[in-house]
Amino acid sequence: MNEELMKTVKLFLLWSFLYFAVGIIGVFLGHICKSEEIMKWTLALGYLLISIVYFGKHYVDLSFGRIERRMVWPAVGMSVLVAVAYMFVSFFVISMLDIYLFMEESESLNKSDPNLFLGIAGILHSCIIIPIVEEIGFRGIFLAGLLKSRCRPWLAILITAIVFALFHMSFVKIISTLGFGIIIGWLYWRTGSIIPGIIIHIVNNSLCIVFAFIDLSIESLAIWWVILVVCLSSLAYGVWWFWKEV
């Protein structure tokens, strides 16, 4: 194992330990105090502290990488387009799995308590801080380290995406999260920056919260096939844009 890969493994294992430690402490304090607010603030502040430490120690590069200054705002816009398009594609796939294969598990996912996302702490934790801290760990440390250790790009992207998906436990979630990880990993490899991934992750998590409060059940399959085609086309265009412009 070369020195760069060894360093990557150590940093990622440390990040993983801190990530789960904050989660356990947050849930424990929330249970002891019988307060969801305490749990949410503990998680938000804990993950924020991890992010500050990793950025402060320069373990992760927070720059636009190979994205030229004049292309920053177009890149932000394309990141949002990719996020929204993939979210609807993912929703369609999970809904099909719900109907044909994993109805009980998908129903349990859809019944997650939306109150966990409410309030300043809930929004900060779910929509902003979690995307940042996860992009630090998976793309900023793990994928970046694999690429620096001369691992083949597609192998590095796939390995990172698999680990990222396994972090999200449920089999139904793994399917959509694996694709999500591959897209964000490819964008990191293409741009040399975790910023597009952070933007996509923030939009994705924000839409997940919105979807928790509204009914998007598939009543007319024909309409959803049209939406799927539009979103796949938008997703392909976003990826093509990053390939062409960066």
Sequence positions of predicted segments:
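Alpha-helical transmembrane segments and their helix-entry boundary regions
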Residues: T8-F12, A75, A156-I157, I174, ...
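Juxtamembrane helix-loop-helix connectors linking adjacent transmembrane helices
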Residues: S63-I130, A144, K148, I218
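N-terminal, membrane-interfacial amphipathic/helix-forming hydrophobic leader that caps
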Residues: M1-V76, V80, V84, S206-V246
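Functionally important transmembrane alpha-helices
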Residues: K173-W225
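Hydrophobic residues within alpha-helical transmembrane segments
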Residues: L14-F17, I129, I159-V163, I199, ...
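Active-site His/Glu-centered metal-binding helix of metallohydrolases
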Residues: I132-G137, I141-F142, S170, V203, ...
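Membrane-helix interface segments
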Residues: E36-E37, M71-W73, G119, R150-L155, ...
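Membrane-interface helix/loop boundary segments of multi-pass membrane proteins
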Residues: V133-I159, W186-S193
